[in-house]
From Swiss-Prot:
This is Beta-adaptin-like protein C. Pfam families: Adaptin_N (PF01602), Alpha_adaptinC2 (PF02883), B2-adapt-app_C (PF09066). The lineage of its organism: Eukaryota, Viridiplantae, Streptophyta, Embryophyta, Tracheophyta. The keyword Transport applies. The keyword DNA damage does not apply. It is found in: Golgi apparatus; Golgi apparatus, trans-Golgi network; Cytoplasmic vesicle, Clathrin-coated vesicle membrane. Belongs to the adaptor complexes large subunit family. It comes from the Eukaryota. Adaptor protein complexes are heterotetramers composed of two large adaptins (beta-type subunit and alpha-type or delta-type or epsilon-type or gamma-type subunit), a medium adaptin (mu-type subunit) and a small adaptin (sigma-type subunit).
Length: 893
């Protein structure tokens, strides 16, 4: 509708539906067109005009393109609520798809794809097949996108009617925009499918690189994103691909630049020549710098992506730190991101410039920005040992300014510097103590108390300083109370004189008798028992040498960083979270006929395993939690548990609660004898491509239990709950079963890989219950773990022999190959091939755990005889024991 059509939105008439109905059936074309515009205007502002469906559909029979577009718009909006009437429009769609005007042909097929009604999809197939082979490229490119929409509605239909093959044929089209749309459609379908659909080989690669130079900017983005998923066969091929893509770095469109950077970064992993890598780093710097002269919103997205890039390849922007200096008119969100990148790029060569900038920022008016700047100085000190003294000098200068929040932030970071460089800069403690009276923030108080306790033997009046804090002990936040407790114990152990003895009695009494905080009370009891039984042991525990803290400027886990770099220029790279952490994507598996499912060249002809087939509509199990109960749904539980174990889980979100079958018995993780009558059984499970924590809570106590909350500690796989624990109030003798959706790679722990999952559960009537569960890989194996035979062999050969781990299971008996493969397929371990070795059967399978870690599996057994030998090859052999645990659990279940 054009600008002068705004009059259609300004009507205030009542009872206009009958009038519109009359105008829609007018014999005059102009009157009908005006009536349709009024209907669209009413629909746009939220009025219900669905009663005019038949009358509007009758207006489709027109040669007027504008009117046809308006009617199609109405159809898209109301077809779902009027599916039976929408069928009336099918004949016109079919007729329009054969119209001489290519615009009308494309419009018809585009609209049919947008109408998400199952009854219409069957009728869409024939016109769509014709449009995919249309003479006009505009029609073909529109039809390509329509295939992706149809796949979302009915994946099986798309497979059966050969649309995927037709889409792949369009990659060879002579029109670059058709190629780009075909690539976009195939990429979309691949993201929502468990089976390999869009795999780029050398032939397709050549066609895409050719089309790249000729298609529009958004077409280039689609092609570059597809190319970034291609794994070159050798360094030479990777160099050739990068050479063809490098000119895109000069493009005016920011999306094209970022997609080109993503693609180049992925291929650089395979390039071995240091000269080539150095030249590529030089070429990528100017376009990334140019992004910072765009609008603030684009700058922010660019900065979030650059943050990831400099963690992987800091040399790209090592000499460009000045472009990240904050301007006076930068929005706060841009300034904050620039600070982060400056910390990452800080080096011994440029630290003086950086410190001057940070010092200037620390005198600005925005409190949050000032705090971040002061903290940045501390992080630079921790990162650069040779610059630490200069950083401390700047912090001391800032403390002398006597601005309260600057002083407090400086004390917080100086505490970290003391941890990083013990027994080096303690001479400044006297200066810090001068600001003692101004501290009013919990973190600053806790930091100052830690410093006093840690260096009590060097501070003459340490007992007086701590006593000044103890006056308000009951009113202090938990963070300060905990630190005061520990600092007082340290003081007593270092100076066991009369003053500290009296202080320790007061503190322990307050912390055990006067408090409701279980953490504080438990720690106080531990100290009390240590001091009363063995003071020397207490010294060994409390005054033990602490590990030196390290630089946190590259804080992302390397595997998570690689995943985020593969998603540059998407929301994932802005959130710094993997897609599955904030998007629940439904994976669709196309059911094939029995003949199609056999592995080519397989000796057994055993079908490859696939995920559970689901309909095109979203399955509730993919997106929601489950609760089986009799009572009505409770209100969402607030996050009172908070940061129970130091983890940083996402905000709690209420979870829907459809019912679920009770399922098989779950292992008990908290027996009633330890839980004051509360018994919890739980286990990680997988359903429809989603990991759940399945729980059964039983109230064997004599009182009502309600207000249940849960928290997961940091763990090796980053498992965290998506929502709050939705459990109804449990009467005595009652029980409830729930399935909590989980995400991965969000709550990562450091150190060696462990299968331990530490959980805390709380309710309104009882203390916090801590228990340990086991992370079983069976629940983590993803649906996209199937490998082609050639890929399996290539990956097996590429991994060193040291990555192969073997284990024998003498107690496991294979009764039949087929039942074994069925069992493994149900846990997403996919059959590749089989061979005979004498009287032994050797099976080859593949599986994949989160972050794309593959497992290449070889099982050897004699059917009917005890004994199973399992060999696994993986890039991360340290988690092989967890894999063997999963295999044993699977066969013994």
């Amino acid at each position: 509708m054009s600008g002068h059509d705004s009059k259609y939105f300004s009507t205030t008439k009542k009872g206009e539906i009958p009038e519109l109905k009359e105008e829609l059936n007018s014999q005059y074309k102009d009157k009908r067109k005006d009536a349709v515009k009024k209907v669209i205007a009413a629909m746009t502002v939220g009025k219900d005009v669905s009663s005019l469906f038949t009358d509007v559909v009758n207006c489709m029979q027109t040669e007027n393109l504008e009117l046809k577009k308006l009617v199609y718009l109405y159809l898209i909006n109301y077809a779902k609520s009027q599916p039976d009437l929408a069928i009336l429009a099918v004949n016109t769609f079919v007729k329009d798809s054969q119209d001489p005007n290519p615009l009308i042909r494309a419009l018809a097929v585009r609209t049919m794809g947008c109408i998400r009604v199952d009854k219409i999809t069957e009728y869409l197939c024939d016109p769509l097949q014709k449009c995919l082979k249309d003479d006009d490229p505009y029609v073909r490119k529109t039809a390509a996108i329509c295939v992706a929409k149809l796949f979302d509605i009915n994946a099986e239909l798309v497979e059966d009617r050969g649309f995927l093959e037709a889409l792949k044929d369009l990659i060879s089209d002579n029109n670059p925009m058709v190629v780009a749309n075909a690539v976009a459609a195939l990429a979309e379908i691949q993201e929502n499918s468990t089976s390999p659909i869009f795999e780029i080989n050398s032939t397709i690669l050549t066609k895409l690189l050719t089309a790249l130079n000729e298609c529009t900017e958004w077409g280039q983005v689609f092609i570059l994103d597809a190319l970034s998923r291609y794994k070159a066969s050798d360094p030479r091929e990777a160099e050739n691909i990068v050479e063809r893509v490098t000119p895109r770095l000069q493009h005016a469109n920011c999306a094209v630049v970022l997609s080109a950077v993503k693609m180049i970064l992925q291929q650089m992993e395979l390039i071995t020549s240091t000269d080539v890598i150095r030249n590529l780093c030089k070429k990528m710097a100017p376009p990334l710098v140019t992004l910072l002269s765009a609008e603030p919103e684009i700058q922010y997205v660019a900065l979030r992506n650059i943050n990831l890039i400099v963690q992987k390849r800091p040399t790209i922007l090592a000499h460009e730190i000045k472009v990240f200096f904050c301007k006076y008119n930068d929005p706060i969100y841009v300034k904050m991101e620039k600070l982060e990148i400056m910390i990452k790029l800080a080096s011994d060569r440029n630290i003086d410039q950086v410190l001057l900038e940070f010092k200037e920022y620390a005198t600005e008016v925005d409190v949050d920005f000032v705090r971040k700047a002061v903290r940045a100085i501390g992080r630079c000190a921790i990162k650069l040992e040779r610059a630490a003294e200069r950083c401390i000098s700047v912090l001391l200068e800032l403390i002398k300014i006597k601005v309260n929040y600057v002083v407090q932030e400086a004390i917080i970071v100086i505490k970290d510097i003391f941890r990083r460089y013990p027994n080096t800069y303690e001479s400044i403690i006297a200066t810090l103590c001068e600001s003692l009276d101004t501290l009013d923030e919990p973190e600053a108080k806790a930091s100052m108390i830690w410093i006093i306790g840690e260096y009590a033997e060097r501070i003459d009046n340490a007992d007086e300083l701590l006593e000044s804090f103890l006056e308000n002990f009951p009113e202090e936040p938990a963070q300060v109370q905990l630190q005061l407790l520990t600092a007082t114990v340290k003081l007593f152990l270092k100076k066991p004189t009369e003053g500290p003895q009296q202080m320790i009695q007061v503190v322990l009494n307050n912390a055990t008798v006067e408090t409701d905080n279980p953490d504080l009370r438990d720690r106080a009891y531990i100290y009390w028992r240590l001091l009363s039984t063995d003071p020397e042991a207490a010294k060994d525990v409390v005054l033990a040498e602490k590990p030196v803290i390290t630089d946190d400027s590259n804080q992302l886990d390397p595997s998570l960083l690689d995943e985020l770099l593969a998603n540059i220029s998407t929301l994932s790279s802005v959130y710094h979270k993997p897609p599955e952490a904030f998007v629940t994507r439904l994976k669709t598996t196309v059911q094939k006929t029995e003949d199609e499912d056999y592995v080519e060249g397989s000796e057994t002809g055993y079908p490859e395993a696939s995920g559970n087939p689901v309909d095109g509509a979203a399955s509730p199990s993919a997106t929601t939690g489950y609760v089986t109960k009799l009572a009505a749904a409770p209100a969402p539980v607030p996050d009172l548990l908070g940061d129970l174990m130091g983890s940083d889980n996402a905000a709690i979100v209420p979870v829907d609660e459809p019912t679920t079958p009770s399922g098989r018995p779950l292992p008990v993780v908290l027996p009633a004898s330890k839980g004051q009558g509360l018994q919890i059984s739980a286990q990680l499970t997988r359903q429809d491509g989603q990991v759940f924590y399945s729980m059964l809570l039983e109230n064997n106590s004599q009182s009502l239990l309600d207000g249940f909350m849960i928290q997961f500690n940091k763990n090796s796989f980053g498992l965290a709950a998506v929502g709050s624990l939705q459990v109804p109030p449990l009467q005595p003798g009652a029980s409830a079963r729930t399935m909590m959706p989980m995400v991965l790679s969000q709550n990562m722990s450091t150190g060696s890989t462990s299968s331990v999952l530490q959980v805390a559960v709380k309710n309104n009537q009882q203390p916090v219950w801590y228990f340990e569960d086991k992370i079983v890989l069976n629940a983590l194996f993803s649906e996209d773990g199937r490998m082609e035979r050639g890929t399996f062999l290539e990956t097996w050969k590429s991994l060193p022999d040291s990555n192969e781990v073997q284990k024998e299971f003498p107690g496991i008996t294979i009764t039949s190959v087929e039942s074994t493969l069925d069992l493994l397929a149900a846990s997403n371990m996919f059959f590749i091939a089989k061979r005979k070795n004498g009287n032994q059967d050797v099976l080859y399978l593949s599986a994949k755990v989160p972050r794309g870690i593959p497992f290449l599996i070889e099982l050897t057994a004699i059917v009917g005889q005890p004994g199973l030998k399992c060999a696994v090859k993986t890039p991360t052999p340290e988690i092989a024991p967890l894999f063997f645990e999963a295999v044993e659990i699977l066969f013994k279940a």
